C-alpha cells in the first residue's frame, strides 16, 4: 500500500491519543526496537505515522520524558535513555 494511502492507526476510543502513542513508543523502547542513545521518531514523523496533530505527538513525547524514557537535546532531537536511567525514574 503506498504511503499516501496508509491505514489509519487503530486508536481506542476511550483513551487519549497522545497516551496511546506514548504507550506504543514505550513498548518499542522496552522491546529494543528503539535502543539507548537512539533518536525517537521526530514529531513530524509521528504525526504522519499516527495521523495526528503535532501537538498530540508533542504530548506523547512529553509523557515519555516525564517518565524518564527519553531526554531532549535542543536542536538535536529526543533520544532514548539507557535502561538503568528509565528504570529508576
Question: For each of these PLM feature ranges, what is it?
Answer:
Residues 1-52, 59-62, 66-71, 76, ...:
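Extreme N-terminal segment that seeds HTH/winged-HTH DNA-binding domains in transcriptional regulators
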Amino acid at each position: 500500500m503506498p504511503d499516501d494511502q496508509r491505514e489509519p492507526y487503530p486508536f481506542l476510543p476511550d483513551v487519549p491519543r497522545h497516551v496511546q502513542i506514548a504507550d506504543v513508543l514505550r513498548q518499542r523502547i522496552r522491546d529494543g526496537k528503539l535502543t539507548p542513545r537512539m533518536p525517537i521518531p521526530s514529531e513530524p514523523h509521528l504525526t504522519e505515522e499516527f495521523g495526528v496533530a503535532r501537538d498530540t505527538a508533542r504530548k506523547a513525547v512529553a509523557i515519555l520524558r516525564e517518565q524518564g524514557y527519553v531526554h531532549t537535546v535542543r536542536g538535536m532531537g529526543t533520544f532514548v535513555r539507557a535502561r538503568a536511567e528509565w528504570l529508576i525514574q
